[in-house]
A protein has these predicted regions:
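Non-heme Fe(II)-dependent double-stranded beta-helix
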Residues: 2-42, 49-156, 160-163
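Short, conserved beta-strand element in jelly-roll/cupin
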Residues: 162-175
């Protein structure tokens, strides 16, 4: 059953609760890139399944739980562009996302930062998909880590960050 929600601006949306409820096509990076690129060009987004292994995702969440969640100091945040302590909700999720994982203090967060750099930022599947879409080698401009939903209002990412030529930058969301 689809979940009926209102966006922060009051728009009604139906959100699938499971993947079987979602009719959005998913593409395989190893044998369906042409269709994926066509879908991206037509719709402005594309979903790929399994670019990163479940094991890598589990290791990343484990490092997050061991290194970031218990940290009592301040970290630079995406929402406010300020250094802040972790803000937890009733589910013990950090609600103020981290901005620029690649800039985390290596003395405090080296294992988390290095893992993200190696297994996500340098992931060959992600890099190949982005190179296919962009027709050039991808470059990281900004990274974020969200654990809890901060109720961002509906937007296009170019409202916040884009290239000199509007629309020539893309974002990758990993879930």
């Amino acid at each position: 059953y689809m979940i009926d929600l209102l966006t922060p601006n009051g728009l009604k949306v139906k959100v699938p609760e499971t993947e079987t409820e979602d009719n959005t096509p998913r593409f395989n990076f190893s044998n369906d890139m042409e269709n994926a690129i066509n879908y991206y060009e037509k719709n402005g987004y594309v979903i790929f399944s399994s670019l990163i292994s479940r094991e890598i995702c589990n290791q990343l969440r484990s490092l997050w739980g061991k290194k970031i969640k218990p940290y009592k100091g301040t970290i630079y945040r995406q929402t406010t562009a300020k250094v802040e302590n972790n803000l937890f909700n009733e589910r013990d999720w950090i609600m103020n996302p981290i901005l620029n994982i690649q800039s985390l203090n290596p003395k405090l967060f080296n294992s988390f930062r290095e893992f993200v750099e190696k297994e996500v930022f340098s992931n060959i599947n992600i890099c190949n998909v982005l190179k296919s879409i962009l027709s050039e080698k991808p470059k990281i401009v900004q990274s974020m880590y969200f654990e809890g939903n901060s109720a961002t209002w509906e937007h296009q990412d170019s409202y916040y960050l884009d290239s000199e030529n509007i629309g020539e930058m893309t974002a990758a969301w990993l879930a």
